[in-house]
């Protein structure tokens, strides 16, 4: 299969004769010369893909880093610090039109940070809060804590 590419352009500097501009009448306008160039491309025998592409060598350290970041499970409210530790924070309420951020801490593993997020979400939002590890059964300790906070009595610590 052949393809033809036509390129047309006007060369304003080209002239049809070798005479100088001084000999032409002053009222004549310079139009230039229109040129057309055709390029024929033959696609009958396309090159093999494997032979035309470059082989790029990626260092093993970059491949390992890319694979570990791709395989990491992302948790809600959890992010990894550049030095490897995991940070957890939760956003709730509104301060100046933006969600208020509550810092939950820095943890050694993503799972620990996700668990801290889940506990904070259940305490702040309630048992229907979106969590990382599913919907846990409502623990009696959480209910006792909410009841004691509402009544103003001594609060129990929930672990």
UniProtKB/Swiss-Prot annotation:
Single GO MF descriptor: DNA-binding transcription factor activity
Record carries keyword Transcription regulation: yes
Keyword rRNA processing: no
UniProt keyword annotations, A-Z: Activator, DNA-binding, Ethylene signaling pathway, Nucleus, Transcription, Transcription regulation
Pfam families xrefs: AP2
Organism domain of life: Eukaryota
Biased composition (Basic and acidic residues): 136-148
Protein family: Belongs to the AP2/ERF transcription factor family. ERF subfamily.
Record-given protein name: Ethylene-responsive transcription factor ERF069
GO cellular component: nucleus
Cited InterPro entries: AP2/ERF-transcript_factor (IPR017392), AP2/ERF_dom (IPR001471), AP2/ERF_dom_sf (IPR036955), AP2/ERF_ERF_subfamily (IPR050913), DNA-bd_dom_sf (IPR016177)
């Amino acid at each position: 299969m052949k393809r033809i590419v036509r390129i047309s352009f006007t060369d304003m500097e080209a002239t049809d004769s070798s005479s100088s501009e001084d000999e032409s009448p002053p009222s004549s306008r310079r139009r230039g010369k229109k040129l057309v160039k055709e390029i024929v491309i033959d696609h009958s025998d396309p090159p093999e893909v494997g032979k035309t592409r470059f082989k790029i060598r990626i260092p093993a350290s970059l491949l390992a880093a890319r694979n570990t970041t791709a395989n990491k499970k992302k948790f809600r409210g959890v992010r990894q610090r550049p030095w490897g530790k995991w940070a957890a924070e939760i956003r709730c309420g509104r301060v100046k039109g933006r969600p208020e951020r509550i810092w939950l801490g820095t943890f050694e593993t993503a799972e620990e940070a996700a668990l801290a997020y889940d506990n904070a979400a259940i305490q702040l939002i309630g048992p229907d809060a979106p969590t990382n590890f599913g919907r846990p059964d409502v623990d009696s300790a959480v209910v006792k804590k909410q009841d004691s906070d509402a009544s103003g009595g001594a609060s129990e610590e929930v672990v």
